[in-house]
Amino acid sequence: MGPPLKLFKNQKYQELKQECMKDGRLFCDPTFLPENDSLFFNRLLPGKVVWKRPQDISDDPHLIVGNISNHQLIQGRLGNKAMISAFSCLAVQESHWTKAIPNHKDQEWDPRKPEKYAGIFHFRFWHFGEWTEVVIDDLLPTINGDLVFSFSTSMNEFWNALLEKAYAKLLGCYEALDGLTITDIIMDFTGTLAEIIDMQKGRYTDLVEEKYKLFGELYKTFTKGGLICCSIESPSQEEQEVETDWGLLKGYTYTMTDIRKLRLGERLVEVFSTEKLYMVRLRNPLGRQEWSGPWSEISEEWQQLTVTDRKNLGLVMSDDGEFWMSLEDFCHNFHKLNVCRNVNNPVFGRKELESVVGCWTVDDDPLMNRSGGCYNNRDTFLQNPQYIFTVPEDGHKVIMSLQQKDLRTYRRMGRPDNYIIGFELFKVEMNRRFRLHHLYIQERAGTSTYIDTRTVFLSKYLKKGSYVLVPTMFQHGRTSEFLLRIFSEVPVQLRELTLDMPKMSCWNLARGYPKVVTQITVHSAEGLEKKYANETVNPYLIIKCGKEEVRSPVQKNTVHAIFDTQAIFYRRTTDIPIIIQVWNSRKFCDQFLGQVTLDADPSDCRDLKSLYLRKKGGPTAKVKQGHISFKVISSDDLTEL
């Protein structure tokens, strides 16, 4: 079974089609009429618009002619480049376009059974976390007999024009498509999770290791059904569509249609002086202005390969506008990468994606308010929603995506297109269960851009530990819904922090409700004991308070370990001490290296401290070798930390 399907406007395709066939009429959609209101609400029409059905435009109309990627698409006099680029990208992976265009063969014109055609189509979009089916009629806007928006160079092919109409209906009108980024569109067509990579900031041309690391990620994404496109930014409007020295167009988005790591045979190793080639195949959606540099069809490299060589290596091209280029040239020529990962197919590990729908809401009570504005609003920032997740091991890449509810359907009522949104990421105590109230010791682990786009992204390699993500609008006191998605190679257990402190219950009242909250950060343990010179010491921490404990990651082969491990405890009394122990991880039996015992009273100094390790037995036990540096903050206000 597929994912749950939401019916837009509650229209049921099969029922509507059966009614039309029974009545012998073509469908006319009452919820998206062939009127100017379905086109624009601000722009002026460049001429008289006549809505025509495909059979009035072509003698032999088809939804798809041959292979969906065989024909080039034109944006039309009122269309936009982002839409054409997204169509081109969508056509690369059959698993994606067949999801957006369900049962495409059943929706096709059948000249042998014209009575089965009812002028009705249905398409599916991933809309704010839900797969949504949109039903439309086949009336398309034309001026002087020509389609106003996108059309195919095969003049009897209509899949893109009909898909575009369904998308316009979903967002309110055709004008609502203006300003959408290719990332927005691809996500809506496929449900993929996007990451935008700045090729220049990544230094992929300078750092060889980073370049091959990028290739590995792109290869994995593509072979798992992801979509990848790239572009060359133009510094000004005048340079849009200007050709580079190597034949590429600025301002246009190229789609990756293949990626290969090739091992060369002995003869080709001598020719190219390398054993491996890292290659990508790209396509220009316009079907022209191909790459003219190395590995292009006119290049010396290409001519040195026989037809058999190309076939054996897989260096083939099936469409006009397709070309091969090396990884090095790819990194050197393109500025921005849109990497859209396929996270909806269980075969590829659906557990890798975790998502939650939330909202920014306003309340006069600071503990109830959930619209605190960006990080600049220090007094209210932590009044935003907060989400915690845990990275189980060092070095995992985590991609975070925050999407606001699309406001385009409200533009005709004077509402803004989008709010400025972003998010902050903090490394927090490993045992945190309640909301953050002040940022005393938390490390700021990352921040997204703040911009008025529909979606903002952040990609980070994170250390093992717990993290709190705070989604925000730039201004405080605004309300809106949002969708937060996190993608990682391992489950991260994303969940919202809703409580400010432990709940009052019969159980904790009987045991004693907490009166003090204590936050501790252990920075380092230095000068640790070695029994003999060549002994390997692999230290780790155990921070205890009563029956609760927090364990740090193991540091390998060092007597001067940097931990920066955080813990937080809600204590019934300061008579319950906090104990920080240092252990040596060994194969059979771990070795105790020493501990410190703290009262952690609210009146204690909050500055960084350093204490010698001692044997077990309290603060007066015998001193051992080594010392730890730490910071402790205690408060009798349970909502301070």
Swiss-Prot record:
- Region annotation (Domain III) ranges: 344-495
Against SMART domains, the record matches this protein to: C2, calpain_III, CysPc
The residues covered by the C2 domain are 498-621
Biological process (GO) annotations held by this record are: microtubule bundle formation; proteolysis; regulation of cytoskeleton organization
Q: Name one GO molecular function term.
A: calcium-dependent cysteine-type endopeptidase activity
Tell me where in this chain the Calpain catalytic domain is found. 26-343
Q: Which UniProt keywords apply?
A: Cytoplasm, Cytoskeleton, Microtubule
Primary localization class, coarse:
cytoplasm
User: InterPro entries attached here?
Assistant: C2_Calpain, C2_dom, C2_domain_sf, C2_III, Calpain_cysteine_protease, Calpain_domain_III, Calpain_III, Calpain_III_sf
The UniProt record describes its induction as: Up-regulated during the osteoclasogenic process. Inhibited by dexamethaxone during the osteoclasogenic process.
Q: Quote the cellular component terms of the Gene Ontology held in the record.
A: microtubule; perinuclear region of cytoplasm; spindle microtubule
Q: Where in the cell is it found?
A: Cytoplasm, Perinuclear region; Cytoplasm, Cytoskeleton, Spindle
Role this protein plays: Microtubule-stabilizing protein that may be involved in the regulation of microtubule dynamics and cytoskeletal organization. May act as a regulator of RAC1 activity through interaction with ARHGEF2 to control lamellipodial formation and cell mobility. Does not seem to have protease activity as it has lost the active site residues.
- Family note: Belongs to the peptidase C2 family.
What's the subunit arrangement here? Interacts (via domain III) with microtubules. Interacts (via domain II) with ARHGEF2 (via the N-terminal zinc finger).
The molecule here is called Calpain-6
* Organism classification: Eukaryota, Metazoa, Chordata, Craniata, Vertebrata
